[in-house]
Amino acid sequence: MQPNIVLINCDDLGYGDLGCYGSEKNDTPCLDALAAGGRRFTDFYMASAICSPSRGAMMTGCYPPRIGFGSFHGEIVLFPGDCMGLHPDEVTMADVLKNAGYRTMHIGKWHCGDQKEFLPTSHGFDDYYGLPYSND
């Protein structure tokens, strides 16, 4: 039986903000329990400090400029109605997992394009429940 995979991406979360990573300030028992029963990344860094490039990079394993989300000095954040997004031909972790027999779902903020061809269901996710973007 294949293991379940749950990948949590949280904007503006510091390395020591959860109890499972040593926080004595924040009480996070549910996330701590989830971490205790699985794998944790202890050296995981995003490719960008802003939404669209970091999410696109995490989904594809590519640097933001490679997937069209700007240069290292002029990264692009997508906004509602933009006619660009993560190109449908890019291979995502959802594509790879689906090919390995997994059922995939994206929950939460996507921020890689809000047009139909850029949404999670066009990138290997079987289901999607969330926001295509936010303006924060």
Please identify what each model-predicted range represents.
Residues 1-136:
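Formylglycine-dependent sulfatase
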